[in-house]
């Protein structure tokens, strides 16, 4: 009897212990699940766009948008090499352009472009169309074959390296299709040959800068300069963009009468053209100019450069947004070389410095430190900003927006897979002010802004970030613009009206 009791007690205690252990494990897993949900919710709450609450109509757009996004992501897991952000944009441009996701983003009012350069804007087709203008001459470099263009009533003077012929005659001689194909290859970096994608940074930059040389004489003809700017406003407006802050070197312009136009006169051309376009398009918010000469000026030339900055600011206090320096950072002079004279400029002149457009650490990227110390309002590219925690602290504290240009950073060899772009970290934390821009869309045959928004949404952003992200990025482009508080208020009202049209149209 006693032995039976012992057996019964042992069996009962084993069951109890098993039951107790199961209960404990269930509690531990429940606590783990709760903490995991909390982590995910906290991360989502920290991401850019999380403060936005979508309306019922916006939810309809969001459902379709996320359905398309998740399809791309799931397909990418099954076929990593087919995932669009893994690829070079040149290899998937045709796929992007034909996708419903891209079409929705393109129709979406995206606010403003805050980072774009003067002669790298319009579609290649439009630039080629300009070569049909009368009085246009060309020559080809005997070594590189690179074209030069010049408008003139008479044949320009030949040199050892340049024999001028009329473009019309050359096109007739070669055949229109052959000529235009050769010209296109010099006006665009677009190329589906992987070897061309995988060159080193300096080689890519030489090709990039070479395009500015090819289109220089064509676009700096004063009548064409204005027409080109107006055309970009038209293309930009059609791409769902209502506002522009344009970086320009203000290169000397010329006309057929031998007149050379200086920086003040060129600013006036921009100003008049902007007013003209706004009059014709009432929902266009406007444009401002950032004077951005190339960062190769020697010490002796810096004071004169700063004098020009002051002059332009005095003559166009509302239209000139501020000052920047452009060109390949790795090869150009660093900001510290200009700092002494920059510090002498009046406080009313704002800065929008390119900084950190590099993969180096502790070298070229130190421009980020100088940009912040000099009081920049925004940072152009800021690709290396994650390597500088002190700069990141100032970016947060002083609301210094980072102008992220995804497509440019890939084409110019900073990143291969968009998922590895440092902008992903910025989009994951709403404390970082960030805007998406396009830099030089003409050179990679991209739309003024839609392709960069697309890559940011599908490649840089989390799978969970949705329409709220895109809406916030559009809002940020107004919030961190150079507009005055009053101008920003009016701009927001104009953008909101277009956003409502977009949402209503989708729900119709």
UniProtKB/Swiss-Prot annotation:
pH dependence statement: Optimum pH is 5-8.
Report the cofactors: Zn(2+)
**NCBIfam families named among the record's database cross-references:** adm_rel
What Gene Ontology terms describe where this protein resides (cellular component)? Answer: extracellular space
Q: Which SUPFAM superfamilies would you find in this protein's record?
A: Metallo-dependent hydrolases
Q: Which UniProt keywords apply?
A: Hydrolase, Metal-binding, Secreted, Signal
Endpoints of the signal sequence: 1-18
Q: What is this protein called?
A: Adenosine deaminase
Return one Gene Ontology term, BP aspect: adenosine catabolic process
> What exactly does this protein do?
Catalyzes the deamination of adenosine to inosine.
**What GO annotations for molecular function exist for this entry?**
adenosine deaminase activity; metal ion binding
Q: Which reactions are catalysed by this chain?
A: adenosine + H2O + H(+) = inosine + NH4(+)
Family under the similarity heading: Belongs to the metallo-dependent hydrolases superfamily. Adenosine and AMP deaminases family. ADGF subfamily.
**Where is it made, tissue-wise?**
Salivary gland (at protein level).
Q: Which organism is it from?
A: Lutzomyia longipalpis (Sand fly)
């Amino acid at each position: 009897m006693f032995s039976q009791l012992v057996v019964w007690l042992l069996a009962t205690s084993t069951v109890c212990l098993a039951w107790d252990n199961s209960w404990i494990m269930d509690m531990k897993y429940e606590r783990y699940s709760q903490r995991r949900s909390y982590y995910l919710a906290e991360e989502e709450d920290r991401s850019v766009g999380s403060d936005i609450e979508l309306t019922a109509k916006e939810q309809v757009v969001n459902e379709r948008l996320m359905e398309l996004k998740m399809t791309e992501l799931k397909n990418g897991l099954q076929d990593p090499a087919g995932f669009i952000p893994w690829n070079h944009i040149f290899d998937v441009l045709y796929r992007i352009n034909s996708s419903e996701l891209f079409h929705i983003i393109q129709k979406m009012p995206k606010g403003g472009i805050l980072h774009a350069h003067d002669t790298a804007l319009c579609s290649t087709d439009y630039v080629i169309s300009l070569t049909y203008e009368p009085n246009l001459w060309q020559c080809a470099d005997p070594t590189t074959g690179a074209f030069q263009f010049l408008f003139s009533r008479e044949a320009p003077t030949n040199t050892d390296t340049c024999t001028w012929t009329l473009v019309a005659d050359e096109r007739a001689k070669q055949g229109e299709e052959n000529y235009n194909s050769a010209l296109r290859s010099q006006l665009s970096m677009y190329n589906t040959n992987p070897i061309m994608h995988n060159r080193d940074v300096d080689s890519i930059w030489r090709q990039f800068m070479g395009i500015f040389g090819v289109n220089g004489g064509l676009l700096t003809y004063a009548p064409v300069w204005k027409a080109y700017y107006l055309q970009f406003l038209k293309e930009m407006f059609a791409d769902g963009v209502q506002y522009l802050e344009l970086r320009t070197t203000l290169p000397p312009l010329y006309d057929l009468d031998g007149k050379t136009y200086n920086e003040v006169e060129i600013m006036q051309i921009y100003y008049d053209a902007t007013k003209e376009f706004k009059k014709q398009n009432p929902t266009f918010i406007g444009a401002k100019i950032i004077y951005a000469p190339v960062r190769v000026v020697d010490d002796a030339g810096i004071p004169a450069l700063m004098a020009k900055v002051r002059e332009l600011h005095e003559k166009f206090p509302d239209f000139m947004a501020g000052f920047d320096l452009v060109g390949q950072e790795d090869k150009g002079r660093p900001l510290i070389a200009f700092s002494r004279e920059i510090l002498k400029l009046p406080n009313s002149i704002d800065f929008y410095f390119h900084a950190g457009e590099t993969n180096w650490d502790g070298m070229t990227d130190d421009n980020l430190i100088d940009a912040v110390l000099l009081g920049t309002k925004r940072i152009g590219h800021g690709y290396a900003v994650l390597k500088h925690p002190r700069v990141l602290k100032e970016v947060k504290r002083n609301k210094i927006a980072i102008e992220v240009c995804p497509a440019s950073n890939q084409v110019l060899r900073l990143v291969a897979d968009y998922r590895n772009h440092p902008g992903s970290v910025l989009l994951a934390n709403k404390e970082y002010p960030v805007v998406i821009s396009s830099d030089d869309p003409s050179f990679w045959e991209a739309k003024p802004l839609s392709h960069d928004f697309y890559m940011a949404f599908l490649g840089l952003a989390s799978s969970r970030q949705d329409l709220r992200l895109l809406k916030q990025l559009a809002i940020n482009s107004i919030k961190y613009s150079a507009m005055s508080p009053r101008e920003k208020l009016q701009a927001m009202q104009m953008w909101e009206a277009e956003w409502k049209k977009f949402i209503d149209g989708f729900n119709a």
